[in-house]
Amino acid sequence: MKQQAWIPALALALCGTAQAQSNEELKAKLDQALKTIEDLQSRVQALEQQKPAAAPAPAPAAAPAAGTWGAPVVSVGTRAEDAKTPDADKARVEVYGQVMLDSIYDFKRMDPDWNATLRPSKIPVVCPGSAGCGEDGAWVFSARQSSLGLRSFIPTSFGLVKTDLSFDLFGSDGSTSIHWLSIWAELGMFGVGQTYSNFMDIDVFPNTIDYWGPSGMVFVRNPQLRITPWSKDGASLAFALEAPNSALDTGKISDISPDFGAGFTGWNRLPDLTGSLRYDADWGHVKAAGILRQVGYQNTLTADNKPSGHETGYGLNLTGSLKVAGKDKLVGAFAWGKAIASYMNDGGVDLAPGDGLRAETVQSIGWLAYYNHVWAENWSSAIGFSQHIQDNTAGQTATAFRRGSYGNVNLLYTPWKNVLTGLEFVWGELEQKDGQSATDYRLQFSTKVTF
């Protein structure tokens, strides 16, 4: 009833108002009201659109950019064997090395340029007249075994490029100076630069602290081009062209004519060809390596460089290791050949005068046998012996190298992972063609910190 009462009243009021105002005024008011309503509707819609939205799903992580030569991702202070699964598509660099001090008491004598290690070929036999002659006994301190290296791993569209640059401080003139060890790069089956010869096996080097090591071991770091065309199930086959070197002994030629003998130098026309076959298993490993080379000579003090010529050298190196009780290991090697002294660790020559003072290749035999024993978690020892023997030619002098013998025994302690210290007894002997010989023996205490 109340609703029916106010509707007629409202109609009468509107009619009165309409009569009091002109049509134009009424139209303007209606337009303004409509505009106000539209503004209110727009504001309501805007408020509704400002409600909290659901959190968007996180975007997937972008794949790391491929490594490039110009912008490597660097990981410094990590060794290859300790590295944690780095990103496969990022280049990285690893710094490694060691700080090492050798404290040596030499009971006898050694060529002063080599007194920081024991090389049988550098033991003075005839005194006076040989380098190292003098009173017995000397203390030697040396940091020359300290080394520094840099490895890099660079992804490319052709595969992973690996490089290795390293040096120690064992200068050949007795100084503490840079001595390059490795300058190497490899991609897949191909390798170039300087590294261990394909003819040698570094895995038979014993657990000793003397720098030079067994005299009868094939050991040389050589510039080379290498290919490993086959590697499967622990077996690998490798070939290399290596830098040639002719180690000459002018022998009795220099006795007859010192000036004439002084003119002879090596003449290397072809690279050395080496090949190796290796097999690794749970029990150890075996390796067979061979070499074929041309060694030559010439006289640079004559007008026509005569006499000159070449001879063929060849050799075989058989090496291996055998795991025995616990963590113990037996390592051994046997090498034989003609004109392979350039590849032996110590002593000998490739070419020397023979009958009628004509050039002949000199035969070498080298061998080593060492036993590496682990006493406890932090204690270990090595004991062994090695020899390099040459079959001297008729034209070599009485003082020519005939045999170098080498042996050592030690006790080593590793208190922490990267620290090693120990005491080693080292013995060596040099025997000449005429049968004269001399020995040297020493005690060496060393401390090494690797990183």
Model-derived features with residue positions:
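Sec/Tat signal peptide C-region and signal peptidase I cleavage site
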Residues: 16-20
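Sequence/structural signature of outer-membrane beta-barrel proteins
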Residues: 106, 155, 168-174, 197-201, ...
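N-terminal periplasmic/intermembrane-space "pro-region" immediately following the signal or transit peptide
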Residues: 21-114
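Outer-membrane beta-barrel "beta-signal"
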Residues: 413, 439-451
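Detector for outer-membrane/organellar transmembrane beta-barrel domains
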Residues: 280-401
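Bacterial N-terminal signal peptides that target proteins for export
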Residues: 1-7
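Outer membrane beta-barrel
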Residues: 80-250, 267-285, 321-336, 340
